Amino acid sequence: MAATMADYNDQIVNETSFYNRMVLSHLLPVNLWEPLPHFLQTWLRNYLAGNILYFISGFLWCFYIYYLKLNVYVPKESIPTRKAMLLQIYVAMKAMPWYTLLPAVSEYMIEHGWTKCYSTLDHFNWFLCFLYIALYLVLVEFMIYWVHKELHDIKFLYKHLHATHHMYNKQNTLSPFAGLAFHPLDGILQAIPHVIALFIVPIHLITHLSLLFLEGIWTASIHDCIHGNIWPIMGAGYHTIHHTTYKHNYGHYTIWMDWMFGSLMVPLAEKDSFKEKEK
């Protein structure tokens, strides 16, 4: 059993070391990162990858909806100012070193065999693999809902943590760059359900890391103020209501938890479409 666990640990470390080399060797001179301990290499890889993802996704998103599709998705008068977007970038950059510490810590725990994470499908079939992904996402959705709600309901937490994000409370101050503009501890608290779920549900290493980093794209999308009206997705239309009312639509991926716990508010456009269907 000890040998099996040691083999598992070695396999995971070899895999994460490969990811470190794959990212860092293309971005930095070898002499700057290779002497670092494995944990610091992992954090540096996550930090650089997180920044690249944030800027590329944010820039492309803004360029498309504010310039290429001007007045198509967002009215000209509702486009956030350059000053507002630069402030959001500044807040996100202050927090980024701390955000990217979380996946480094989760990888450390995975490498030491403390979680239910796995790196091969040797002991699972594809059906179980997808079932566990679904359970993982349900757990994450449930936990993020309650973390987010308590960040509003507990006044101390709101004042000292979550209020930083709610500086952006109007359509003309929200942009994709606001997606990661949090107090560092606030951002970590809302991402930590991904780590807690590792101890409850078996999940593939790549799936866990991919979902963590896809959060960057997801949070950009729900701050663009464009209501996609794709049921039951908690899109930007719902999240814009959250930023303006402060007491609705705490959910993350879907409207499920808000519907279950009575905090759902449907965007006006969707209400109108419902009325038309009833007629």
Swiss-Prot record:
Instruction: Decide whether keyword Iron is in the record.
Output: yes
Annotated GO CC locations: endoplasmic reticulum membrane
Which ranges belong to the motif Histidine box-1? 148-152
State the membrane topology. Multi-pass membrane protein
Q: Which residues form the Fatty acid hydroxylase domain?
A: 134-263
**UniProt keyword list:** Endoplasmic reticulum, Iron, Lipid biosynthesis, Lipid metabolism, Membrane, Oxidoreductase, Steroid biosynthesis, Steroid metabolism, Sterol biosynthesis, Sterol metabolism, Transmembrane, Transmembrane helix
User: Which EC main class describes this enzyme?
Assistant: oxidoreductase
Listed under GO biological process in this entry are: sterol biosynthetic process
Q: Where is this motif: Histidine box-3?
A: 239-243
Q: Which GO terms describe its molecular function?
A: delta7-sterol 5(6)-desaturase activity; iron ion binding
Subcellular location(s) of the protein: Endoplasmic reticulum membrane
Going by the entry's taxonomy, the superkingdom of the source organism is recorded as: Eukaryota
Record remark: domains: The histidine box domains may contain the active site and/or be involved in metal ion binding.
What family does the Swiss-Prot or TrEMBL record give for this protein? Belongs to the sterol desaturase family.
Q: What is this protein called?
A: Putative Delta(7)-sterol-C5(6)-desaturase 2
